[in-house]
């Protein structure tokens, strides 16, 4: 997907993207590739691949599930790495107020430089483990209308890291590749215990390649019990509802 094809794909979905926004994506790509030479940010570095598998993939919540995004919404991105999915969404939908939490300081340093270069406002970067970031005494707990994750962790693990951060009546949106059926089956108990309810598992295909993608949307129905999230490392080693 070339930058021009990226622009057309967004226009086909009803998003008119300005020259300034396209320039922001071009700068993002340049900085990602340059920094990646000495900080491991991504295995994907070819321009066409980055525009499809990072930039387009990251904005799919806005394209495929726009009903969950209102102007000025507070969004938290857990384990964003090189800024995915939240910063491409911020470029496309500038009114979002974005908080990114990541456990690796090198990535946060890159993101600080990137946010400055892109002249993005209302972006907060936090170096922390998700388990402590959302703990019972954290100021960030149950603060966000939307929490996203595009991580490789299973849904049962991601739910424990993300749902505690969601306000009641807010949404946790997980960006997943194919085969979510088993993950949803394994994660059902965790979602319920943490105060969530599965709303939809929306499947769609990426343009150009037709690769399958899913958006799993969970609504926060009640407060998360204080004992969650458990201490760092525990959710991954011993997921809620593990058989």
UniProtKB/Swiss-Prot annotation:
Please give the InterPro entries that the UniProt record associates with this protein.
rRNA_ssu_MeTfrase_G, SAM-dependent_MTases_sf
A cellular component term from Gene Ontology for this protein is:
cytosol
Which keywords label this protein?
Cytoplasm, Methyltransferase, rRNA processing, S-adenosyl-L-methionine, Transferase
Major location, coarse class?
cytoplasm
Q: Pfam family example for this protein?
A: GidB
Region Disordered: start-end pairs:
219-243
Q: What is its EC number?
A: 2.1.1.-
Which positions in this protein are listed as binding S-adenosyl-L-methionine?
Answer: 79, 84, 130-131, 150
Q: Name one GO molecular function term.
A: rRNA (guanine-N7-)-methyltransferase activity
The domain of life for this entry's organism is Bacteria
List where in the cell it is found. Answer: Cytoplasm
Q: Which NCBIfam families match?
A: rsmG_gidB
Q: What does this protein do?
A: Specifically methylates the N7 position of a guanine in 16S rRNA.
The entry assigns this protein to a family as follows: Belongs to the methyltransferase superfamily. RNA methyltransferase RsmG family.
Record-given protein name: Ribosomal RNA small subunit methyltransferase G
Source organism: Pediococcus pentosaceus (strain ATCC 25745 / CCUG 21536 / LMG 10740 / 183-1w)
């Amino acid at each position: 997907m070339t930058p021009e094809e990226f622009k057309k794909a967004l226009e086909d979905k009803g998003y008119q993207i300005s020259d300034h926004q396209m320039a922001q994506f071009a700068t993002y790509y340049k900085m990602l590739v340059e920094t990646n030479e000495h900080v491991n940010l991504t295995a994907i570095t070819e321009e066409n691949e980055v525009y499809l598998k990072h930039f387009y993939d990251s904005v799919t919540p806005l394209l495929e599930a726009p009903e969950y995004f209102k102007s000025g919404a507070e969004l938290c991105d857990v384990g964003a790495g090189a800024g995915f999915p939240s910063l491409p969404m911020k470029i496309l939908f500038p009114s979002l107020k974005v908080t990114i939490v990541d456990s690796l300081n090198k990535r946060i340093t890159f993101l600080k430089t990137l946010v400055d270069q892109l002249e993005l406002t209302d972006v907060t970067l936090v170096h922390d483990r998700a388990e402590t970031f959302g703990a019972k005494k954290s100021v960030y707990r149950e603060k966000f209308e939307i929490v996203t994750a595009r991580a490789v962790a299973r849904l049962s693990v991601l739910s424990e890291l993300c749902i505690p951060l969601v306000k009641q009546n807010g949404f946790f949106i997980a960006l997943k590749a194919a085969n979510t059926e088993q993950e949803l089956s394994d994660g059902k108990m965790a979602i319920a215990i943490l105060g969530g309810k599965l709303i939809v598992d929306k499947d769609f295909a990426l343009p150009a390649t037709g690769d399958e993608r899913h958006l799993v949307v969970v609504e926060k129905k009640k407060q998360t019990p204080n004992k969650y999230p458990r201490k760092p490392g525990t959710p991954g080693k011993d997921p809620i509802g593990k058989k």
